[in-house]
Regions:
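An N-terminal, globular interaction/scaffold subdomain
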Residues: 9-117
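Aromatic- and glycine-enriched beta-alpha-beta binding-site module
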Residues: 88-127, 198-230
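Charged, compositionally biased non-catalytic regions
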Residues: 1-57, 121-182
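Long, compositionally biased interface segments
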Residues: 281-359
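Short intrinsically disordered coil segments
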Residues: 74-80, 122-127, 236-239, 279-280, ...
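Conserved small/polar residues in nucleotide/adenosyl-binding loops
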Residues: 361-368
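A contiguous, surface-oriented mixed alpha/beta subdomain in the mid-to-C-terminal portion of proteins
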Residues: 178-308
Length: 371
């Protein structure tokens, strides 16, 4: 079966012309926006996914007897790992939940084996981060398109809240944004603007590709237990600016949640490219295959200590991980520099140490100090 999958080799990545200059331009523009947001709040936030909805701790189970093409990287051997998840809204500022936005599911898997991607990994070299969003593709799938789109994204995020809250205006805004940048919006992005589906019932995607051991894949997380499956497609009742925080918190006070983590392996680089994250990898060509199970028990997802820990202390970066899950494509390459620069700024301005958890003990220490 593995013969149908494209083998990873360094040549699958092809740097774009003037890519380094484009990356420098993007990171400088993002740093400028970061400073502007800091001046508004007198507190530094992430330049993407600034607002958190909740912070979860749970367990990843890697099952026994995965087939060879799936038993790759940190999923090569059965076992259990502690995990942490930060749920968030995508914009790089603190907007009202009444404003429709993509949502994020940042997964940190603790104490994984394997050679590190970065020689001087600021994450202390223990974990694997997978960053996912409830959209399967990016409108700006390359660094060049991202550079074109960036001023319009910044302009849209600075629009007055009443304008942003109108679903119709958001849908028009998506078209307006991408048309001004010179390329069409994917149907998946337009569809996102139609409603605010329950964040715990959504499927989350890495959007861009990464190495999956001997192969190439995109990673996703989907609801597994009935407790979250029944929330899929359900409209959230958002009556105040931080309603999603309360929706998530109320859920985990009563219920547990289970999700599957999946890999969609590349079968053809022509139709499933790594250098353009705007191209949807069709399930007819390669279905999503289960590689693990995530379990989240009942818990308080937004205590004051957890909010500070997830928003100010922790970092999530697709380059915090092992070589067998190397991020691929120009969008992932720009993230290497952009995320590092943003994290450094955030920790410095908020006078927080750049540390990573060795276990849940690190989180418990913060919760104890918060009591």
């Amino acid at each position: 079966m593995s013969a149908n999958y494209v083998n990873y080799r360094p040549e699958v990545e092809q740097k774009q012309e003037n890519e380094e200059e484009d990356i420098l331009h993007i990171t400088e523009q993002m740093a400028q926006t970061n400073n502007q947001v800091f001046d508004r709040h007198r507190h530094a936030v992430r330049d993407a996914h600034a607002k958190s909805h909740g912070f979860l701790k749970g367990i990843l189970t890697v099952p026994e007897n995965l087939p060879a093409h799936l038993a790759q990287g940190i999923f090569a051997h059965p076992g259990y790992y502690d995990v942490m998840v930060r749920l968030s809204a995508a914009p790089g500022d603190l907007h009202s939940d009444k404003t429709p936005a993509p949502h994020g599911f940042a997964l940190k898997i603790l104490n994984v084996p394997g050679q590190r991607l970065l020689p001087n990994d600021p994450s202390d070299g223990h974990h694997q981060d997978f960053l996912m969003v409830n959209i399967p593709v990016l409108t700006f799938g390359t660094v060049r398109k991202y550079k074109q789109m960036l001023p319009f994204i910044t302009e849209a995020e600075q629009a007055p809240e009443p304008v942003m809250r109108s679903l119709r205006q958001v849908m028009r805004g998506v078209d307006y944004l991408v048309n001004r940048a010179g390329f069409p919006a994917p149907a998946s992005l337009k569809g996102l603007a139609r409603s605010q589906h329950h964040v715990l019932g959504e499927t989350y995607h890495s959007m861009a590709a990464l190495r999956y051991g001997d192969y190439i894949a995109k990673i996703s997380v989907a609801p597994e237990s009935d407790s979250v499956k029944k929330l899929t497609g359900i409209q959230m009742q958002i009556n105040d600016d931080s309603a999603i925080r309360d929706i998530v918190r109320d859920f985990f006070q009563k219920y547990t949640a289970d999700y599957v983590i999946r890999a969609q392996l590349c079968t053809d680089l022509r139709t499933m490219p790594v250098e353009d994250a705007a191209v949807l990898w069709k399930e007819q060509e390669s279905p999503h295959q289960v590689i693990g199970h995530l379990h989240f028990p009942q818990q308080d997802t937004f205590s004051p200590a957890r909010r500070v820990y997830s928003d100010d202390v922790l970092s999530f970066n697709p380059w915090h991980g092992v070589t067998e899950h190397q991020p691929l494509g120009s969008i992932m390459r720009v993230r290497m520099q952009a995320y590092e620069r943003s994290s450094s700024f955030r920790h410095r301005m908020n006078t927080q140490p750049r540390t990573e958890p060795v276990s849940y003990t690190h989180l418990r220490a913060h919760e104890t100090r918060g009591n």
